[in-house]
């Protein structure tokens, strides 16, 4: 295209769709002898989720002192804990737990 405005001559109007073969011809080897050691799949067939350390700062339900928790969890389980903390689950400090 040349100039400031596009003209009909600048476009290719005679394009035809191309057909594509969607079959996969890949040959896979027999993997029944191999043991899966990468830890991706559990025995129940679910993929293993990555875990990380998470730091939680909250308050004691009884005395309002600051509590710091460190958990090692998956992101999904962390969200579950978050929903529980926002709901009815209350955490107490060791001092209040002894009372």
Curated annotation (Swiss-Prot):
InterPro entries, per the entry: Papilloma_E7
GO molecular-function term, one example from the UniProt record: zinc ion binding
Pfam families: E7 (PF00527)
PTM comment, free text: Highly phosphorylated.
Subcellular localization, as worded in the UniProt entry: Host cytoplasm; Host nucleus
Annotated region (E7 terminal domain), positions in chain: 1-42
GO biological process: DNA-templated transcription; symbiont-mediated perturbation of host cell cycle G1/S transition checkpoint; symbiont-mediated suppression of host innate immune response; symbiont-mediated suppression of host type I interferon-mediated signaling pathway
Zinc finger (unnamed): 60-96
Motif (LXCXE motif): 22-26
GO cellular component term of the entry, any: host cell nucleus
Sequence segments annotated as region (Disordered): 26-47
Motif (Nuclear export signal): 78-86
Domain of life where this protein originates: Viruses
UniProt keyword list: Activator, DNA-binding, Early protein, G1/S host cell cycle checkpoint dysregulation by virus, Host cytoplasm, Host nucleus, Host-virus interaction, Inhibition of host innate immune response by virus, Inhibition of host interferon signaling pathway by virus, Interferon antiviral system evasion, Metal-binding, Modulation of host cell cycle by virus, Oncogene, Transcription, Transcription regulation, Viral immunoevasion, Zinc, Zinc-finger
Listed HAMAP family: PPV_E7
Protein family (similarity comment): Belongs to the papillomaviridae E7 protein family.
Subunit relationships: Homodimer. Homooligomer. Interacts with host RB1; this interaction induces dissociation of RB1-E2F1 complex thereby disrupting RB1 activity. Interacts with host EP300; this interaction represses EP300 transcriptional activity. Interacts with protein E2; this interaction inhibits E7 oncogenic activity. Interacts with host TMEM173/STING; this interaction impairs the ability of TMEM173/STING to sense cytosolic DNA and promote the production of type I interferon (IFN-alpha and IFN-beta).
Domain remark text: The E7 terminal domain is an intrinsically disordered domain, whose flexibility and conformational transitions confer target adaptability to the oncoprotein. It allows adaptation to a variety of protein targets and exposes the PEST degradation sequence that regulates its turnover in the cell.
Role of this protein: Plays a role in viral genome replication by driving entry of quiescent cells into the cell cycle. Stimulation of progression from G1 to S phase allows the virus to efficiently use the cellular DNA replicating machinery to achieve viral genome replication. E7 protein has both transforming and trans-activating activities. Induces the disassembly of the E2F1 transcription factor from RB1, with subsequent transcriptional activation of E2F1-regulated S-phase genes. Interferes with host histone deacetylation mediated by HDAC1 and HDAC2, leading to transcription activation.
Protein name: Protein E7
Protein's organism: Human papillomavirus 52
Gene that this polypeptide is encoded by: E7
